[in-house]
A protein has these predicted regions:
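Active-site recognition of the HExxH zinc-binding catalytic motif
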Residues: 95-108
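Extended low-polarity, hydrophobic cluster-rich segments
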Residues: 40-43, 94, 98, 136
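A metal-dependent hydrolase signature that marks the N-terminal structural subdomain at the beginning
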Residues: 2-70, 74-79, 88
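Surface-exposed helix-capping loop/turn segments at secondary-structure junctions
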Residues: 49-56, 110-113, 145-149
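Post-HEXXH active-site segment of zinc metalloproteases
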Residues: 91, 107-136
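Long, well-structured alpha-helical subdomains associated
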Residues: 124-127, 138-149
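Short pre-active-site segment immediately N-terminal to the catalytic Zn-binding motif
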Residues: 80-97
Length: 149
């Protein structure tokens, strides 16, 4: 009976220590991810200074978890989503945020959002006129931002 309790407390103790280690690692990883939010917020403010549009700036949301996307802009919620896992390099994050900012800049009405969707159906993503422009602006602005910062 004493050996049962000994093993029980050893196993419970090991699980407790492992859970503490796990929480500590999560805390350290979260601190490392903060650079992404700070950089994205700085780039967003920089874009707003260069290309002001409306009073209400877009919300910025950094998303954890797997995705095939680097980022996206949602007109209805006025939100730019950045997928952390696909923006681990400074250049990629700046380029993605600049790209999505230009979607925000160009899609400023329901009719323009509808036009984007119609063109997406007609041209596809790679040949979409707005995607071509946003890709070019994202790359150009990323070089300019990183050169100065």
């Amino acid at each position: 009976m004493d050996t049962f309790f000994t093993y029980y407390f050893i196993i419970v103790g090991v699980f407790f220590v492992l859970s503490l280690i796990h929480e500590g690692i999560k805390l350290l990883v979260r601190d490392q991810d903060d650079w992404q939010f700070e950089l994205a917020n700085d780039v967003l403010n920089w874009c707003l200074e260069l290309y002001p549009l409306r009073k209400q700036k877009p919300q910025l949301t950094l998303v954890d978890g797997e995705s095939t996307l680097a980022g996206e802009y949602n007109f209805y919620t006025n939100t730019i989503f950045i997928y952390r896992v696909n923006n681990v390099l400074r250049h990629d994050l700046v380029k993605t945020l600049s790209h999505e900012y230009f979607h925000y800049y160009l899609i400023n009405s329901e009719s323009k959002n509808t036009l984007y969707q119609k063109q997406l159906d007609h041209y596809g993503y790679d040949s979409h006129p707005q995607e071509i422009l946003c890709n070019a602006m994202g790359e150009t602005l990323a070089k300019l931002y990183l050169k100065k910062n």
